[in-house]
């Protein structure tokens, strides 16, 4: 076995590439096992074998050797090997089938102590089956009926059965196999549901992240401990159970759902975790299942329990719930006569029915908060992307739900085939009316009545000037935000002067700039020439990437740790220098063998050495000088019996080059040649003078060095070969990577951990950032949306005149607008390297949004809108939290919805940088009439004025339990 845990007998690069390439095309099969590999390691392996056709320049080079498989970057806790939250496929990890994993493991091994991260393939979807690897397992809270305070956490796959959970609970709570048990699903504060179908899967049962399950062993006399309580609660509804509004907080809030199910990476079965964590007092001492008397709640002011990262869904639902025309339609049961169960594009009416049931609960006035379990289960069945417990996008859920409701409620039973016609110079009004009528012939529902409008799209060929005008329906407006022209980066500068600590800077660089722009900006603040800077990405004590000056800054993600090193291209005498990456490693004995392993630590270095002086001795001196700031002098009883040769650390030259034999066996033959006090270095090992010198030194301890050198791969996990120690020049270049290996005792005595990690803050970090006027008006976004643009070279238009694809100019205009205008602010942007969120404040009116000036139909009616709801997103892309503001249709007051919590809000709180999706209601005198089938620009239909919406709402703040 090679150093670092890999096998020497591995196939050549071409064979590895061929075998893995075929396996990576394996299709997902339900129940199959797949493995997670850190994408950084996998990318290094791909470079090493030339996996990608565009990256085959350095195939097989030693410095690219990836070493043993290292998944440490995926763990939030290296000890328990728990996965980090919000890992993203291809960006953070890659998935490989079991056979591919086994091959890589045989060829390279795995970092010692790490267990494979294996997961199962599960199936989603009701009609169209969709397989995906279940990366995050579901965390369930388990307890016994007799001791509800003893709560244990355990992870399960959605493919596990209820019988599997029961078996695990029997084992955890020491319940004999012959004793009868019942399993209960407990949620909110006092609602139970028996899980009687043991062959149901976790997914079938609708269990969610943080769900509490109670196991109830039967009494010896054959009765059940909860029998009396069960009879009291037997009238509870079987779906979407609720609790009393008097319960202001959940008695088991301490075991509520964490942001994401991490699973247990040490579990190789992929079924459920063998490790169980114990919670504190998971339940209150009172374990009463009887529901409290119902109290009147203002209809519509109903919170939604978080089922584990479902705040995105709750936010979207609260906005739709407070869309009066749609909610009235469901509350009046008008949907029942229009359900289309035969629509092949629909969901057999099940989404419409699930939504109707939820809306009725939310507007019943009985429930302060409900858990939308069954609704989420139904959504997950038809849209697998929403079936898990990872953070999703509220706008994407809205898009799915509006489309799903439309198809479930489509009044058109058989859609006719219609041929699309081009305008061909006909008047816009004629073409628009034709397009809308054709749309209504195939799509006729309450969603079309309420949410659909019409775009005008104009394309002009740059070659023949052909003009193509089409009119297309839309359900919501996605508006771009003016892009930021620059970005702020926080980086560390490591000066060449070893006496100076690294300094953290905050610099402003062009958003789409190059690495050279970063160096120029840093040069202005530091005074160091930009040409003497090397920009690196440091990850896990190694250089993940060393950037070239012409590389784009979009390759650098906001979370990357960027270190800029000052280096010297020439020495003081003008000779050329070579700059070498150097890693710190500690040699540790492996408990299972007599060999040693190396563990990376500390901050890597870039060390410059004159090419004509690149010997082992000069390299040692250069490194010692570089680290002199954090080399400490040990106490007399700490340094051991042998003196230490500190080299340049204390200004002295080498006194002896003798190293510990176990550490530097490969440098044994060069010891005398590196010593100045023991001879000239020209003596032959067998000469009389050499032998006399050795005898002279034999009786006294020989100084040890701080560390030894190894030529390693760019990951620092595998040794390539030893360095020449005969005094000759070392054959190293800037692509070589060195490791300085310390034994544990020397590191403990001489290496000052605290000083090595200490850095200074530049004044740019201490000064508050200048806040530019970043707010933009909503009209600016609309104008940007309607601005003419040229299509990109990868997105051309096929010109029917030229008979070829052209980069035409394209312009969108608004022709007619719907009764409910949904505006999606496009805050999220991403490319192959990084993701970003625009936190720009968009100033949008709460009242009187006049869209008439943006509508190009000259005969259009006035379009004036009032805001009725906002979906908010706090945090970064892929993470964070969703909430909603919404205006209650009965009392006209604004409320803030944060999962289960509902509180009164003021209008001046609504416009924030978190606003993501806006809901506007058109001013119309008869808005709540049954939606007509007319063209959306017509004047029929209207809105009941909010002043006439009478209600007896309570103005107090509702503080409810958040799951």
UniProtKB/Swiss-Prot annotation:
Motif Nuclear localization signal, chain ranges: 767-772
Region (Disordered) residue spans: 219-277, 634-701, 930-963
UniProt biased composition (Low complexity): 244-261
Motif window: Nuclear export signal: 133-141
Residue ranges constituting the DUSP domain according to the UniProt record: 11-122
Activity regulation description: The completion of the deubiquitinase reaction is mediated by the DUSP and ubiquitin-like 1 domains which promotes the release of ubiquitin from the catalytic site enabling subsequent reactions to occur.
Region annotation (Interacts with DUSP and ubiquitin-like 1 domains and is required for USP4 activation) ranges: 485-775
Region of interest called Required for USP4 activation by providing conformational flexibility between the DUSP and catalytic domains, as start-end residue ranges on this chain: 229-295
GO cellular component: cytoplasm; nucleus
Acidic residues biased stretches: 953-963
Domain USP: 302-923
InterPro entries: DUSP-like_sf, Papain-like_cys_pep_sf, Pept_C19_DUSP, Peptidase_C19_UCH, Ub_carboxyl-term_hydrolase, Ub_USP-typ, USP_CS, USP_dom
Keyword DNA repair part of the UniProt annotation: no
Record localization: Cytoplasm; Nucleus
Binding site for Zn(2+): 461, 464, 799, 802
Catalytic EC class: hydrolase
Region (Necessary for interaction with RBL2): 405-407
Entry EC no(s): 3.4.19.12
CDD domains attached to this UniProt entry: Peptidase_C19R
Catalytic activity: Thiol-dependent hydrolysis of ester, thioester, amide, peptide and isopeptide bonds formed by the C-terminal Gly of ubiquitin (a 76-residue protein attached to proteins as an intracellular targeting signal)
Post-translational modification: Phosphorylated at Ser-445 by PKB/AKT1 in response to EGF stimulus, promoting its ability deubiquitinate RHEB.
Role according to the record: Deubiquitinating enzyme that removes conjugated ubiquitin from target proteins. Deubiquitinates PDPK1. Deubiquitinates TRIM21. Deubiquitinates receptor ADORA2A which increases the amount of functional receptor at the cell surface. Deubiquitinates HAS2. Deubiquitinates RHEB in response to EGF signaling, promoting mTORC1 signaling. May regulate mRNA splicing through deubiquitination of the U4 spliceosomal protein PRPF3. This may prevent its recognition by the U5 component PRPF8 thereby destabilizing interactions within the U4/U6.U5 snRNP.
Family: Belongs to the peptidase C19 family. USP4 subfamily.
Quaternary structure note: Interacts with RB1 (both dephosphorylated and hypophosphorylated forms). Interacts with RBL1 and RBL2. Interacts with ADORA2A (via cytoplasmic C-terminus); the interaction is direct. Interacts with SART3; recruits USP4 to its substrate PRPF3.
Domain characteristics, as noted in the entry: The DUSP and ubiquitin-like 1 domains promote ubiquitin release and thus enhance USB4 catalytic activity. However, these domains do not bind ubiquitin.
Name of the protein in question: Ubiquitin carboxyl-terminal hydrolase 4
Gene giving rise to this polypeptide: USP4
């Amino acid at each position: 076995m090679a150093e670092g845990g890999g096998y020497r007998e591995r196939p050549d690069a071409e064979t590895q590439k061929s075998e893995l390439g075929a396996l990576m095309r394996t299709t997902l099969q339900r129940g199959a096992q797949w493995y997670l590999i850190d994408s950084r390691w996998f990318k290094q392996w791909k470079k090493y074998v030339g996996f990608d056709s565009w990256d085959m320049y350095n195939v097989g080079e030693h410095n690219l050797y990836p070493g043993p498989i290292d998944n440490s970057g995926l763990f939030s806790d290296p000890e328990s090997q728990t996965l980090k939250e919000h890992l993203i496929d291809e960006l953070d990890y890659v998935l490989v089938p079991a056979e591919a994993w086994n091959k890589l493991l045989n060829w390279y091994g795995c970092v010692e102590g790490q267990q494979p991260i294996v997961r199962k393939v599960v199936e989603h979807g009701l009609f169209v089956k969709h397989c995906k690897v279940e990366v995050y397992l579901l965390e369930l809270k388990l307890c016994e009926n007799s001791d509800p305070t003893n709560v244990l956490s355990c992870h399960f796959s959605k493919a596990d059965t209820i019988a599997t959970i029961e078996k695990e609970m029997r084992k955890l709570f020491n319940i004999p196999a012959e004793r009868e048990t019942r399993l209960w699903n407990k949620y909110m504060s006092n609602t139970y549901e028996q899980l009687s179908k043991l062959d149901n899967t976790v997914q079938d049962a609708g269990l969610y992240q943080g769900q509490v399950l109670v196991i109830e062993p039967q009494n010896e006399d054959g009765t059940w401990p909860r029998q009396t309580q069960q009879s009291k609660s037997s009238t509870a509804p079987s779906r979407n159970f609720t609790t009393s509004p008097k319960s202001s907080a959940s008695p088991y809030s301490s075991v509520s759902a964490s942001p994401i199910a991490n699973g247990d990476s040490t579990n190789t079965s992929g079924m459920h975790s063998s490790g169980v964590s114990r919670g504190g007092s998971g339940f209150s001492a009172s374990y009463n299942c009887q529901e409290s008397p119902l109290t009147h709640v203002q209809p519509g002011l109903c919170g939604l329990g978080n089922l584990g990262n479902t705040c995105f869904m709750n936010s979207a639902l609260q906005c739709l719930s407070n869309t009066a025309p749609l909610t009235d339609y469901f509350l009046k049961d008008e949907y029942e006569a229009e359900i289309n169960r035969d629509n092949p594009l629909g969901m057999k009416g099940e989404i419409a029915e699930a939504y109707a049931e939820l809306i009725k609960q939310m507007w019943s006035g009985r429930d302060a908060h409900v858990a939308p379990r069954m609704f989420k289960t139904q959504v997950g069945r038809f849209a697998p992307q929403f079936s898990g417990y990872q953070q999703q996008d509220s706008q994407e859920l809205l898009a799915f739900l509006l489309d799903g409701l439309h198809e479930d409620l489509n009044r058109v039973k058989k859609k006719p085939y219609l041929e699309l016609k081009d305008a061909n110079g006909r008047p816009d009004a004629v073409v628009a009316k034709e397009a809308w009528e054709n749309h209504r012939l195939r799509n006729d529902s309450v969603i079309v009545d309420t949410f659909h409008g019409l775009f005008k799209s104009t394309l002009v060929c740059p070659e023949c000037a052909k003009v193509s005008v089409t009119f297309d329906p839309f359900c919501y407006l996605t508006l771009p935000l003016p892009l930021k022209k620059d970005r702020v980066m926080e980086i560390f500068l490591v000066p060449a002067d070893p006496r100076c600590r690294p300094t953290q800077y905050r610099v402003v660089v062009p958003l789409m700039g190059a690495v050279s722009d970063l160096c120029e900006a840093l040069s202005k603040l530091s005074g160091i020439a930009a040409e003497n800077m090397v920009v690196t990405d440091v990850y896990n004590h190694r250089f993940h990437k060393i950037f070239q000056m012409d590389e784009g800054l979009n390759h650098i993600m906001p979370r990357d740790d960027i270190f800029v090193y000052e280096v010297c291209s020439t020495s003081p005498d003008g000779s050329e220098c070579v700059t070498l990456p150097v890693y710190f490693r500690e040699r540790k004995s492996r408990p299972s063998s007599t060999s040693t392993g190396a563990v990376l630590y500390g901050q890597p270095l870039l060390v410059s050495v004159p090419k004509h002086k690149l010997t082992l001795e000069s390299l040692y001196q250069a490194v010692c000088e570089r680290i002199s700031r954090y080399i400490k002098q040990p106490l007399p009883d700490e340094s051991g019996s042998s003196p230490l040769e500190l080299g340049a650390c204390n200004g002295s030259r080498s006194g002896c080059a003798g190293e510990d034999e176990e550490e530097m066996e490969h440098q044994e033959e060069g010891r005398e040649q590196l010593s100045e006090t023991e001879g000239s270095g020209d003596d032959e090992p067998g000469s009389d003078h050499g032998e006399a010198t050795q005898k002279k030194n034999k009786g006294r301890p020989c100084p040890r060095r701080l560390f030894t050198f190894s030529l390693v791969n760019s990951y620092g996990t595998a040794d390539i070969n030893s360095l020449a120690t005969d005094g000759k020049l070392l054959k190293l270049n800037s692509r070589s990577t060195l490791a300085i290996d310390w034994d544990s005792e020397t590191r403990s005595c001489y290496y000052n951990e605290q000083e090595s990690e200490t850095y200074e803050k530049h004044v740019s970090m201490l000064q508050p950032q200048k806040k530019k006027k970043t707010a933009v008006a909503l009209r600016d976004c609309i104008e940007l949306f309607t601005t003419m643009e040229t299509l990109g070279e990868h997105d051309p238009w096929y010109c029917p005149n030229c008979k070829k694809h052209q980069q035409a100019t394209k312009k969108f205009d608004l022709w007619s607008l719907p009764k409910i205008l949904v505006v999606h602010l496009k805050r999220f942007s991403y490319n192959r390297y990084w993701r970003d969120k625009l936190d720009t404040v968009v100033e949008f009116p709460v009242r009187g949004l006049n869209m008439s000036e943006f509508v190009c139909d000259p005969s259009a009616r006035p379009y004036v809108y009032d805001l009725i709801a906002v979906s908010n997103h706090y945090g970064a892309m892929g993470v964070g939290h969703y909430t909603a503001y919404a205006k209650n249709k009965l009392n006209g007051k604004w409320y803030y919805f944060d999962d289960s919590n509902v509180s009164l809000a003021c209008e001046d709180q609504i416009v924030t940088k978190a606003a993501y999706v806006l809901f506007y209601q058109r001013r119309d005198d008869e808005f709540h009439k049954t939606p007509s089938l007319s063209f959306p620009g017509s004047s029929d239909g209207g809105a009941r004025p909010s002043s006439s919406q009478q209600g007896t709402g309570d103005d107090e703040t509702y503080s409810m339990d958040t799951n």
